[in-house]
Amino acid sequence: MAFELKPLPYAYDALEPYIDATTMQLHHDKHHAAYVNNLNAAIEKYSDLQSMSVEDLVTHLDRVPEDVRTTVRNNAGGHVNHTMFWEIMGANGSGAPTGAISEAINNSFGSFDAFKQQFNDAGTKRFGSGWVWLVRSQQGDLQILSTPNQDSPLIEGHTPIMGNDVWEHAYYLKYQNRRPEYLNAWWNVLNWEEINRRFDAAMSGH
């Protein structure tokens, strides 16, 4: 198998009370697992695709045969998006950024509160299923954007630094139709050390 589902880096209940254990278990063990399984099935007969990283797959969809391109776009996107999602959260999350990303957010958006409001607004306004992101754009600046379905910012040449899943499966058991409430609660579980690591890598081009 080319791709594997990594275990969650913390217990299912580690993000309580903001994200419940049942949601985490279903989200990781069922939804994310399905993306990995579907991706592996799609590339089973393409050994060259199996040797690519998931990031390379979504960055270079033009290299993917047309008969499996949409399946790879959806499921490789789901895999790379969720892998980041788990890693940028943690049991000892903090609501306020630390380190270099804090200064960069202030410089780009005026303040953390202004950034948070713009980020939450973008997530609230994403129609249907999708994601909201902070990215290093192709031009090198920080931008907030949202993508539909499981599309990764990598498809458009942007480097994701952090992202929140606004598919209903990410929050519906606890928040039902109250997506803005979920978006606001999510800030309490962020692992800013990991986000800083991704920020440094994005800004240095790695």
From Swiss-Prot:
SUPFAM superfamilies reported for this sequence: Fe,Mn superoxide dismutase (SOD), C-terminal domain, Fe,Mn superoxide dismutase (SOD), N-terminal domain
Transmembrane regions: none
Cofactor: Mn(2+)
Keyword Secreted: no
A single Gene Ontology CC term: cytoplasm
Catalytic activity, EC: 1.15.1.1
Keyword Oxidoreductase: yes
GO molecular function, one term: superoxide dismutase activity
PROSITE patterns the record matches: SOD_MN
Catalytic activity entry: 2 superoxide + 2 H(+) = H2O2 + O2
Pfam families assigned: Sod_Fe_C, Sod_Fe_N
Keywords: Manganese, Metal-binding, Oxidoreductase
Ligand binding (Mn(2+)): H27, H82, D165, H169
Matches recorded under InterPro entries: Mn/Fe_SOD, Mn/Fe_SOD_BS, Mn/Fe_SOD_C, Mn/Fe_SOD_N, Mn/Fe_SOD_N_sf, SOD_C_sf
Cofactor note: Binds 1 Mn(2+) ion per subunit.
Induction trigger: By methyl viologen, and under conditions of iron or nitrogen stress.
Top enzyme class: oxidoreductase
Oligomeric form and interacting partners: Homodimer.
Family (UniProt): Belongs to the iron/manganese superoxide dismutase family.
Purpose of the protein: Destroys superoxide anion radicals which are normally produced within the cells and which are toxic to biological systems.
Protein name: Superoxide dismutase [Mn] 2
Organism: Leptolyngbya boryana
Gene this chain is encoded by: sodA2
